[in-house]
Amino acid sequence: MSTEPELHRNDSSPSRNPEDRRKRRRPEDYVEAISQHSTRAKEHFLHPGTHYRPLAQFLKGSLHKSLRIRTVSQPRPHIFAALHNLDCSFDDPNRVRFFDSKEGLDDFASYPLPRKNCGQLLFLRGYPSPKWVQLIGAKYRVDAEFFRRHLSIGQISEPFDISVLPSASQNIVKLSITSLGKQNVTLSKQGEGVDSLKDFHESLGDDPNVVGDSIVRRYSVHDKTRFSIEQDVTMCVLKTGESWIAIILLDCGRDLDEGPAGPWIESSSRPHMHGFDNVFNPVLLFEPNICLKSFEKKEGTSSSNGTQLLQKRCFQQSCSLLHTKSYGRFLSPAVMNTDAFYALSDVFNFAACAESQFLGLLKSKFMSETHLHNKEEHMKECLLDLKDHKLLLHEHIQGIQAVISIINDRGGSRWPRAGSASDAARMVSMTPSARRSSKESMLQVVVERPAITEQEMLPARSGAEAEAEAMAQRLLKDYEALRSDAQALSDLYSEGMRDIRDNAMLAESRKAIEQARGVGHLTLLAYFFLPLSFTSTLFGMNFKELGDDVSIWAC
């Protein structure tokens, strides 16, 4: 009798000993658990773990990385982790704690878990080190699949081992943020940028002393002066007893001029970077009465906000500020503390605004180049450009549709939601200042909310539920509008491609007509030339001399 089921049960069954559970929370035990699962081959296990081998090697530091030239020799100090305590008010100095990429590891290890009935947001910025992943994974018992998917670049994964099934992504939410850049693009072909990006991926993590390099998933050239990069935000929500924590992995970490070389910066221009203006356009966020509110809620100085503004940073991106104290400034603290999706709504809103600007760039580019579709010398170039951008749009439409599904599910079925816990328990768990801020915020919700019908009152919702639902509906409308705009733009690109093909066929028809006319002229010339040529040839032949009294007809 085979012993495989018994071995599998012994390996996977959780221990009931509390001491074993505490040991399993150690970083080394977290790595060992992943490493053991990665050794399970398909020949012996129904659930093989061979696709976790690269992650296990990464956590052990055994992935082979060749040290390459970096854009700067001494990177700036970097805030890698930012922890938001949602039970504190925005003015409370304990609301946000920042942890440096080097010295902050030990401080983070000793930082307590969220209090009862309280939530936390943990932002991790850039490419992590194995030690940070080990510590966070062990402390919060994070599913290894969460890290594996986010690190699915370079040597960490194969392109076919990321499942697209919704059931495989119940607590893994991924958003894409597009940043628009302006610079003199010297790459002659898009393929050169792809090769350079591949080298960039292979260089990530090559220096163990540098943590938090920005990750770029896609680099696209739109014309000679404009390009875009795509970066991911991967999120999950974990419950720790009666509290919860949301982990947000941001691709945006250090400025791109501090990390490995990439196609967005040429080797010849690196020494002169301080002479450039800002390379990336800002992401413009909309908030009603923002000009008035910004005076009432000052966002603090650079040091208190977790940023470094000591010198001009040409490659700074707007998403590099998502982790700061400014996050959630216009949200209700009480609802953030009880509803995980609402607490993460600013991330969804930021991604939507970035996507809107990206679609606006593509639309303006299409409109400004429409006149080139009729010029024969530009047809081939325009057709290839439209084809590439249509494929890019198709992937963006798929991403937008995925986000719409996430919003409809409110992130996940197990995410904490407003109304699941009593308001009294929530208010008791919050600090006094946060409690006052919560009452003012909820009062504002009640005052600003229009009259509701009886249908809307069934079932009756608390103020927190109403606020969370209103935010979800707002995001849903925004993303549905983005999907509609992207689809309309894709149709424009398809129409443009058809116009170019029609114009090309018309040009070929004109050429054929001109060639036919030329052939007609040649035929007319041949009509007269051939008999004349035959006659001249005939009389030019050598004949035997005839007598004077014999005619040629007699011959």
Would you name each region that the model predicts?
Residues 2-378, 385-392:
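Extended N-terminal soluble domains of membrane/secretory-pathway proteins
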Residues 148, 157, 504, 540, ...:
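Hydrophobic alpha-helical segments
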Residues 335, 339, 350-351, 360-536:
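Membrane-associated alpha-helical segments
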Residues 525-555:
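Alpha-helical transmembrane anchor segments
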